[in-house]
Amino acid sequence: MALWHDKRGRFSLLRAVTLPILVAPLIALIYFTLTHDLGARPRTEAIHEVGLWGLRFLLAGLFITPMRKIGRYALLIDIRRMIGVAAALYMVLHLILYIVDQAYDLGVVVSEITLRIYLTIGFTAWLGIMVLGATSNDYMVRELGGMRWRNLHRLVYPIAVLGVIHYFMQSKLEVFEPTWIAGIFVWLMLYRYMHWQFPRGDEFPLWVIASTWFAVGALTFLLEALGFYIAFHAPIGRVLLADFNFQAGVRPGWYVWGAGALVTLIGWIRLPRASREPQFRPAQ
């Protein structure tokens, strides 16, 4: 069955739009490789790029559940597996390019993974996502049974944690994107925890969703400031003030707040019209 068909074999516009989005980063990477635009260390840049896109798509897959509920887009479930498999394939390429960069010397590769803790963490996450990728098909769902399959795929949460930690550690001082990615991941986990702790038949009110985004964004600002204090002994208050000086660029916390504003706006737009309009009661 073609990738742009749904499970019933019908053409799916959503899948047809998603497929080129998933392939676009790889096409761009090939183009920049052929035009020698990957910088002074093209192999290293390629390794980092495919790994980063793998992590981005992993988080995009985790976004499907909240957007289905908050945005009332039930059809999004149709592309969750596609996004997850794409994340796994980018991670496969991530390791292949690393092996190529080590001149195909598997002894060196094993030694590096064993001796460098950030590579050990990354490889552990890689093994996990390979298991999830290999079982992301209807055959494995039938073989394992629905309950066992779902329990297995809950491993995506610790895998994502390891992936974010690996990204932080290999980034060293360039932690801008790892910080906002971590902030968004924290919100995704908080959202799931809320639904687990307070099961509801319907979605949480939008003011609750917006409040959680605000809190996680504030936490992102604070943790970034704490990181600067630990690394450079920069006063936390001064770092927090600098977050509101856009001449130095937009800091990670703003990305988290921006994502929260977008999710909340989508949720508001998708509300039934009667829920959006103020309700007036006649005077008694």
What are these regions (language model features)?
Residues 1-284:
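Membrane-embedded alpha-helical bundles that constitute the cytochrome b-like, heme-associated redox core
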